[in-house]
Amino acid sequence: MPVVLVVNSGSSSFKYQLIEMDTESVLASGLVERIGEPTGSTRHKAGGDSWERELPIADHTAGFQAMLDAFAEHGPSLEEEPPVAVGHRVVHGGDVFVEPTVVTDDVKADIDDLSALAPLHNPGALQGIAAAQTAFPDVPHVAVFDTAFHQTLPAEAYTYAIDRELAAAHRIRRYGFHGTSHKFVSEAAARLLGKPLEETRIIVLHLGNGASAAAVQGGRSIDTSMGLTPLEGLVMGTRSGDIDPAILFHLARHTDLGLDDLETLLNRRSGLLGLTGLGDMRDVQRAAADGDEAAQTALGVYRHRIRHYVGAYAAQLGGVDAVVFTAGVGENNPLVRRRSLAGLEFMGIGIDDDRNELISSEARFVSPEGSPVAVLVIPTDEELEIARQSLAATAG
């Protein structure tokens, strides 16, 4: 009964899941947060029960010790069934890492070197890896990169039309993100369609507070909406998605906004929040239903951008077998699904209202029976995908 511990570490917190790989079931999960603050906290779930504790957590090493204490006190026992691998989510692997990689000192050095591309994410992942290696010194650790799935993009998809020497010197290209989710969902879609993965043409819409689209041909990503950073592409909760870059020059010249201010504007004060003052899709929909014109416009912009990418990716794929919705908004918001695909019937893409309104946590069809293009809702499971990749990377 091999078990894998999956860790998603940030600068001041980390989440974990212990997954039994024969049945792919979650044995335990938890959260350690407020690391480095006067009062930290842990939350541990196992066997249908949950326990919380407040305590000082000086650093990630202390956080992992608190996690080990929770396992020892509440189970399951890691001494009786130690993990065969520890899988770590790492946001940015650049063009260095194209697959899950067993962690070595050289790998950690490369991840650190890539922190310039992900300053908010990679350093926290490294802290988590170091602490986890202290906690589990005899277990292989595997780094699974959000960007790796998109390393199959062709040059015409990942290249920006700027000075090529400048781009090369600063590693400027499209990397894409949410790759672990896009991989998990596209493979699940092939199984649901009953087709070999190599024969599928799938558009995945990962719609959460962060959002991205991907065109997946034969199980390989050939295009994706996020770029050098997770800022490009679809409209998101607080991020702008695609804009004319000259907007930044205009604002720099005509306001007192500096470089950091502009970065904050696009990442944290734009998207649905910037358009409406509301960052949650459900709140925006309620406001729109109550007649708020700004909210109605925001929903229109959100849907317009999704349709833009669906059409573009259908062209890149040369046809579509399935459009798949996943992540928090994509899985749980029937109105977003219906309105985002409205008007695409000429492409064979449509929604069955009864299927679409069904509340379910299962993977399912929401398109009409016999539709030329399947529309699917598939709950993503990035932790399980990390566990699968970690186990595969350490096998043999």
Swiss-Prot record:
Q: Which residues bind ATP?
A: 15, 206-210, 280-282, 328-332
Which gene is this protein's source? Answer: ackA
Q: What is its EC number?
A: 2.7.2.1
Cite a single GO BP annotation.
Answer: acetyl-CoA biosynthetic process
Q: Where does substrate bind?
A: 89
Where does the record say this protein resides?
Cytoplasm
Task: Provide the residue positions that the database annotates as binding Mg(2+).
Answer: 8, 382
Q: Could you name the active-site residues?
A: 146
The free-text note explaining how the cofactor binds reads: Mg(2+). Can also accept Mn(2+).
Q: Which cofactor does it need?
A: Mg(2+); Mn(2+)
GO MF entries: acetate kinase activity; ATP binding; magnesium ion binding
Keyword RNA-binding in the entry? The reply is no
Q: How does it assemble?
A: Homodimer.
The scientific name of the source species is Clavibacter michiganensis subsp. michiganensis (strain NCPPB 382)
Q: Which HAMAP family match?
A: Acetate_kinase
Please explain the role this protein plays, according to its UniProt record: Catalyzes the formation of acetyl phosphate from acetate and ATP. Can also catalyze the reverse reaction.
- Decide whether keyword Phosphoprotein is in the record: no
This protein's pathway reads:
Metabolic intermediate biosynthesis; acetyl-CoA biosynthesis; acetyl-CoA from acetate: step 1/2
UniProt keywords, alphabetically: ATP-binding, Cytoplasm, Kinase, Magnesium, Metal-binding, Nucleotide-binding, Transferase
**Principal localisation:** cytoplasm
Q: Return the Gene3D superfamilies for the record.
A: 3.30.420.40
What's the name of the protein? Acetate kinase
A single Pfam family it belongs to is Acetate_kinase
| Top-level taxonomic group | Bacteria
Listed under catalytic activity are: acetate + ATP = acetyl phosphate + ADP
NCBIfam families, per the entry: ackA
Q: What SUPFAM superfamilies does this protein's entry cite?
A: Actin-like ATPase domain (SSF53067)
A GO cellular component annotation in the UniProt record: cytoplasm
